[in-house]
Amino acid sequence: NGYVYLQYRMYGETEGQDKVGGKNWNENNNYGRLQLEGTINTTENQTFYYRLRTYDSLNSDHSWDKDDELKMHYTVNHGNLGDSKVNFASRVQYIKDIDHALRYEARFDFAEYMFNNDFIKTTEMVVAPYYEYTWNRDGVKSSGDNYDNEVGLYAYFGNQLPYGFGFNVELDTLGFHNYGDKTHGVYDGVDLKADPEAKKNSDSNTDAAVNIYLTYGANLYSSEKVSVDFWAETGYDSYSWSDKVAKDADHEKYELKTDPQVTLTYHATPTLDLYATAGAEYRNWMRTNERSASNWRWQPFGIVGFRTTF
C-alpha cells in the first residue's frame, strides 16, 4: 500500500520585483514546479519513498535558477532496541539535482521518552548519524576529484501543541566534509573582491544548518465532499553556519519566512482528493548574511493537484 501525490505549483512575481534588481529581491519569479511524490510500503517494516521535481517558465524569460531534482530513499524499520522504547531504522537515500548524493542514515527515534500530555505531544525525536558521498559537484562531469566525503548528524524534533499549533526543530546537517582536492573544496579567506575568479582553496570544512518552525493549521469549512483549511509555517528556513568562508563573508546566514495559505479540497472518493491552494510566502530571498539580512518581500503562489491512496 501507499500513496501518490501529483501537484503543479505556480510562483508569481515577488513584491516590488519590477522596481529593483533581481539580486536585491528574488532571482526566482514567474515559474512553475511539477512534483510527483509517493510512498510504497513494500512490507510492514520497509518503505520506498520517491519525489520528482521539474521546473518550467511561466513567461518568455528563464526566470528561475533551480535544477530538476530526483529524491529517493528506502527505509527499513528494525523495531525497538532490546527492551527499550528507542526505535531503530536504516535509510539509504539518493538525490540527483546538479550533482549526485548517496547517503546512509542510522535513525534512532526517542519519541516514546519525550512529551505526551495535554499541552505537548512529541511525534518524532529522531537522531541520525550519517555518511554521504557526493560526486559531480557543481555539475562538472570531467573531474574525478570533484567529490565530497561527509560524515555528520541529522536530528528532528516534532511536536503537536494545542489549538492546531505545532513546533518543529530540524538539524538538517552537522557535517564534516573532506573534498577531493582544494580546487573543488570551499573558500577559506579568499578575497573575492580582489580576485573574483579565485579557486576554492580548502579541501575540508565543517558546517551546520538548522530549521525551526512554528506551524498552525485550522479547518475553516467542511462538508461531506468539500473542506477548506488554513495552514502557515513560520520560522528559520534555515539558519546555517560554515567554518570556512571567503574573506569578510559571514560565517552565519539565515532565511526567515512565513507562508500563509488556504486550501480547498474536494473529496472525490474515499481514496482520492482533488485540491487547489492559494497563498504567499514572505522571506528575505537574497540578503541572507546574518549581519545584513533584509529585503523581506511577498511572493504569491498557487497549487493544483491530487492525492490518492492505495
Model segments located where?
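Short glycine/proline- and aromatic-enriched beta-strand/turn motifs that initiate or cap beta-hairpins
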Residues: 1-58, 134, 301, 307
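Outer-membrane beta-barrel channel domains
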Residues: 25-115
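Detector for outer-membrane/organellar transmembrane beta-barrel domains
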Residues: 109-248, 308
